[in-house]
């Protein structure tokens, strides 16, 4: 039974990229009037986008009359579905675009408004069984249009349908065209790949821990990237326990040994700029496939969410998928240490001392502060490539959620130029970052052990900052490095216009944008 569920899950992952198809105008297949839907925009001044204006004129003002009779005022997020607008158009979703001329809008606001408008329209039409959608290309940039459409169509569960068979998703195959066809069709394709990449991260993060062990994680990545690996575009290297011991990664092994599930150390290499792989960017993702807290066990309430504690690893490998699929001229390496954090007779205990790969000793005060342990060894290894930048991504601390909530990820770096780039990429993608302090005083809080060089937990005060200070101990001098604490943005507690309640897959698109910005 378990094997059948896993096989169905692999089939879902393979099909996830094919939810949408880009098709030319008037070339939709198997379409009927009953399954067609149109998405048009309206501004707060009651002005339609061109396709909406055409439909309004063709129906003697029916669209505008309907708007005036409704609560829809053209604000971003508003939507109204009309039926039987013309004999050829069975459904029209009118989506609010806000003010038409707003010179004060930032890049973030403009891009987000497009994603929100498209996402609300797709969800509204999909709920009415429309599967062949025509979107007015004048609503916004083609790239953000594709992102809003693909991301909003994502849904993942194991519920049984009327047939009694378990399904991983209720997603239907939806065909999308833009009207009029944009000159920048490549932008739409790029947005599609960006959204598919994030959706893959969401699949990994949503999958329950019994179906996503470290071994399963590697299998899913191998399946997702099969074409890229087979074609030689991506090299996949899977390290086992003995290699970790040979590398003297005592912190990683100290966490992994508490579980019966074997650890994995996954490396992916993409050489899009040069065959020698020089001047690479390295993404390091925390890969705790389930975090019970270990001997310092977590409270039972909401522990199930800790299936997503490998969100850093999920977004790192998903970014690799996007970068390689886009064929960006950049060299990229992803490193993901994968294991579970479990209590057992073999598990590390509070008070134990571990020796890191760089030779430093660490007193384990709290086994639930395990992410920084596996990341420390992985970061030391990442430095051996002498990359241009190292970015680690981790659901590291509850403290960052308390500080920033679900709307910003915390960014720690001492390199101003790196922060500027990441901040710009976050504004483009809509996955916002907030710079947090990384000063020596926080590191000193991690040096309070009487028996070791470092302690892995310094208490409540400045928790996220102290964790970042701990990680910095494993970065070589003068190495450009940033730590992204994504614990707050790991999941969304409510449905949004284009991101549903659940695991978000953030900041996958930001990582892809960063690689794009650093092409050689």
Swiss-Prot record:
Protein name listed in UniProt: Cytosol aminopeptidase
Principal location: cytoplasm
Upper taxonomic lineage: Eukaryota, Amoebozoa, Evosea, Eumycetozoa, Dictyostelia
Active site: 298, 372
Organism, as annotated: Dictyostelium discoideum (Social amoeba)
Known cofactor(s): Zn(2+)
GO molecular function list: manganese ion binding; metalloaminopeptidase activity; peptidase activity
Assembly and interaction partners: Homohexamer.
Function: Presumably involved in the processing and regular turnover of intracellular proteins. Catalyzes the removal of unsubstituted N-terminal amino acids from various peptides.
Catalytic activity, as annotated: Release of an N-terminal amino acid, Xaa-|-Yaa-, in which Xaa is preferably Leu, but may be other amino acids including Pro although not Arg or Lys, and Yaa may be Pro. Amino acid amides and methyl esters are also readily hydrolyzed, but rates on arylamides are exceedingly low; Release of N-terminal proline from a peptide
Gene this protein is translated from: lap
Keyword terms of this UniProt record: Aminopeptidase, Cytoplasm, Hydrolase, Metal-binding, Protease, Zinc
Location of the protein in the cell: Cytoplasm
GO cellular component, one term: cytoplasm
Family membership noted in the UniProt record: Belongs to the peptidase M17 family.
């Amino acid at each position: 039974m378990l094997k059948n569920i896993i096989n169905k899950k692999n089939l879902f992952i393979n099909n996830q990229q094919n939810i949408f198809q880009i098709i030319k105008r008037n070339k939709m297949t198997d379409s009927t009037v009953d399954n067609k839907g149109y998405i048009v925009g309206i501004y707060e001044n009651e002005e339609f986008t061109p396709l909406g204006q055409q439909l309004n004129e063709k129906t003697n003002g029916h669209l505008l009359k309907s708007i005036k009779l409704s609560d829809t005022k053209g604000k971003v997020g508003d939507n109204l579905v009309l039926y039987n607008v013309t004999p050829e158009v069975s459904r029209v979703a009118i989506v609010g675009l806000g003010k038409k001329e707003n010179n004060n809008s930032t890049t973030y606001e403009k891009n987000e408004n497009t994603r929100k408008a498209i996402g609300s329209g797709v969800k509204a039409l999909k709920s009415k069984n429309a599967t062949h959608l025509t979107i007015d290309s004048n609503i916004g940039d083609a790239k953000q249009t594709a992102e809003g459409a693909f991301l909003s169509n994502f849904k993942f569960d194991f519920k049984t349908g009327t047939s009694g068979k378990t399904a991983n998703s209720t997603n239907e195959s939806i065909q999308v065209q833009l009207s009029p066809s944009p000159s920048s069709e490549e932008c739409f394709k790029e947005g599609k790949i960006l959204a598919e990449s994030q959706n893959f991260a969401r699949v990994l993060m949503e999958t329950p821990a019994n179906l996503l062990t470290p071994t399963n994680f590697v299998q899913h990545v191998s399946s997702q990237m099969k074409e890229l690996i087979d074609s030689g575009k991506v090299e996949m290297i899977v390290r086992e326990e003995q290699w970790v011991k040979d590398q003297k990664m005592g912190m990683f092994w100290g966490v992994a040994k508490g579980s019966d599930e074997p650890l994995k150390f996954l490396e992916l290499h993409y050489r899009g700029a040069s065959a020698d792989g020089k001047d690479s960017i390295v993404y390091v993702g925390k890969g705790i496939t389930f975090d019970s807290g270990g001997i310092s066990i977590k409270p039972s309430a909401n522990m199930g969410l800790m299936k997503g504690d490998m969100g850093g690893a999920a977004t790192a490998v998903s970014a690799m998928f996007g970068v390689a699929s886009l064929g960006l001229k950049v060299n990229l390496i992803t490193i993901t240490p994968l294991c579970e954090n479990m209590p057992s007779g073999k598990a590390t205990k509070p008070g134990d001392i571990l020796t890191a790969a760089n030779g430093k000793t660490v007193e384990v005060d709290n086994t639930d502060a395990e992410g920084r342990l596996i990341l420390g060894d992985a970061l030391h290894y990442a430095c051996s490539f002498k990359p241009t930048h190292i970015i680690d991504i981790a659901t590291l601390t509850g403290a960052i959620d308390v500080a920033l909530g679900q709307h910003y990820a915390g960014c720690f770096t001492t390199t101003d130029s790196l922060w500027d780039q990441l901040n710009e990429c976050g504004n483009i993608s809509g996955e916002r970052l907030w710079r947090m302090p990384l000063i020596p005083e926080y590191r000193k809080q991690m040096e309070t052990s009487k028996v070791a060089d470092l302690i892995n937990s310094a208490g409540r005060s400045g928790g996220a900052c102290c964790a970042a200070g701990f990680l910095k101990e494993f970065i070589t001098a003068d190495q450009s490095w940033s730590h992204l604490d994504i614990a707050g943005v790991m999941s969304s507690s409510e449905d949004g216009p284009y991101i549903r309640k659940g695991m978000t897959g953030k900041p996958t698109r930001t990582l892809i944008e960063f690689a794009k910005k650093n092409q050689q």
